[in-house]
Structure formats: structure tokens, C-alpha cells
Amino acid sequence: MLFFVIMGCVSANDLSTLGENTTVPNIIIVGDAPEVPDVPDIPDIPDFPVDPDNPDIDDQNDSDTVNLTIFNIDEYFVDGTLGVEHSNTKFVLTQNFDNLGLLKIEANNVTILGNNFTLQNVAFLINGKDVTLANFTLVNDFDFKDADGAAILTLANNTHIRDCVINYTVPRDSEGYGISAVGRRIAPISGLEVINCIINFEGHNYKANTYNYALKVSNCPNALIANNSIYTQLPLRDVNFGAVGADLNSNYVASVGIEYSNNLTFIGNIVASIVNKRPGSPFPTLDG
């Protein structure tokens, strides 16, 4: 099976004819793609992470199952934090949730199964390993500064984000990311998977030197980013070249930004970008 990545990239070497609020609709027209040799098939993905020494999924996920409601969620996310005492637990959403703010996951081996419910103005900061977020919708128009502005920020190994929808309108001139996975050069993140997700991301960092990315992956070797649809509306911004050239931090806007992530698989994804503003700068760019 052969997949193609569709990515939008808009740049301007001479954009004098563009107006202040120029919009570029449907910027991608795809014709017949050339043959690409040796493109691997997406590997079969289990519903939940599987311990290779114990592949029985049911045995791994039925030790503790909690149905979350508005009446009991504070018993587990105490002051917004799921502590390590709740490791090895599967949480099942039973309704929509609003305005919970930033939820921090410190516990390990946790699954949050959404059952297609919606979380409005809720963000996740993942510090525990082996965490799965699956099958819910996030609708945000608030910048979560304690999560670097991300709707989902993971700093831990083996984070699995599957079948989620993220609709994020970042407040004007604020930092924001749909999904952000950030390791360090001396401590990279392993086991990251983002699969079958839809990200609708709208950024408005017209003037401030803040970052707006739908997806950011840094220091995550061997990550799997597969079968996602990423749609962005972003302004054109100048690339901030440093003394030795440009890197990811040189771009204030991007649909997808990936760095220092060797052997990452990016396959079967659709990425489409629309320009929502052209500030007065000499060489504005929007990277796909």
C-alpha cells in the first residue's frame, strides 16, 4: 500500500501584490504523483500499547477501570494532577467536560478513552510513561501557558495519541501547539505515536515572536506519525536566521515542525495550510 504526504508551504520572495489580509484558499492541487520506491506500509497498530512480554491486551488494561464523570474526576485529578498512585488505570469518559484547564498526568501506564466525547478548554501535560489518549475531541481557544501553549504536551516515553480531534484557535500573539512532543538531546523521547488524528489549528501570532505549530516533534527518534489530517490557518512570518543559519526555532509558524528525530516515520498524513494574514515583513514564509 502506498501513501503520500500532502504538505502546504507558502513563501514570499516578492509579495508586493498581496494585501494586508490576503487569504489563500485551497492552496494545494494534487495531480498524479510520481512513483516513490520503497515506501513502507504502515505497521499494524494495536488498540493499546502492548507489553512484548505479555501481548494479552485485556490483561494489561483491566486491572483498574474508572468511569470518569463531573462528580468524580476531582478524586483522581487532584488539583488537576493525576498522581502516580493511579498508575495502571484505564479511565473511560462518560460525558463531555468543560473548562477543566490543564490536566497533568504523572501516573504511568494510563489510558484515557474518550468514547467520542468532547473536552472544551482542556489540555494535557504528560509526564508519565506509557500513556494513551484515544477517541475524544479537544476544543480550545485558551492558551495553556503551563503546557507551553499546547493542547497536548508530552515530555515522556511511550505516549500514544490515537483517533483524537483537536480544534485549537490560539489567542492572538500567544504561543500555541496542537500536539507538542519535546525531548532533550541528552534524554530523547522514545515510543511516540500520533495516529489517525485530526488537527484543526488556527494561529494569530501576527507580531509577537511566539511559536504557532499544529504539530511539533523534537528529539523523538523512531516516532510514528501516521494517517493524520492536519489543517492550519497561519500568518506569514519572516524566518529568523541566526549566525549559523536557520533551525526549527527560526520559524515562528509551521503546520508541522520536526527536529532531531532520527528514524521518524511520517506516512499517510495530509497537511494543508491557508494563510490568514500577511504582516508587513520583507520575506514572510509559512512552512508546511
Predicted regions and their residues:
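Tyrosine-centered aromatic motifs in long, intrinsically disordered, low-complexity repeat arrays
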Residues: 39-42, 164, 201
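Secretory targeting signatures
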Residues: 1-24, 93
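Low-complexity, acidic Ser/Thr/Pro-rich repeat tracts that form intrinsically disordered stalk/linker regions
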Residues: 13-75
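Extracellular beta-strand/beta-solenoid scaffold signature
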Residues: 99-102, 120-125, 142-153, 171-187, ...
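N-terminal extracellular ligand-recognition/capping segment immediately after the signal peptide
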Residues: 71-82, 86-110, 116-122, 137-138
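Extracellular beta-strand solenoid repeats
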Residues: 92, 98, 104, 111-113, ...
